[in-house]
Amino acid sequence: PEEICGLIGGTKDGDVREVKELYVLENIDHSNEHFSMNPLDQLKAVKDMRAKGIVPLGNFHSHPESPSRPSEEDKRLAYDKEASYMIISIMNEDEPVLKSFRIVDNVSNEEEIEYI
């Protein structure tokens, strides 16, 4: 399957981020190894976030054939030091694995995810 991708919208209170909305966007690369978000979809998502009083928290994408950790390309393309980068691995479709990372200067650090 192709990688899925999108934006994460929510609220921030210090280091605590609460996800309120996920915006699934078109992967214009149509690839199982890469993704690029449709710029028009990104703009629409950010406008919707503003209308709802939430802020962009980061982005998400899937790894259909690899673990849920940032690839070298993911690290290289991580331009926002404040963003959360969520990756879901679907290598085992029966047990998907979701992880979130902050990436600064090509170094990734896993963030805790709390489901409420």
Q: Where do the PLM segments sit?
A:
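Short, well-ordered beta-to-alpha junction loops that form the rim of enzyme active sites
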Residues: 62
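Conserved, mostly hydrophobic/aromatic
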Residues: 59
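Conserved beta-strand-loop surface patch within small alpha/beta domains used
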Residues: 1-56, 65-116
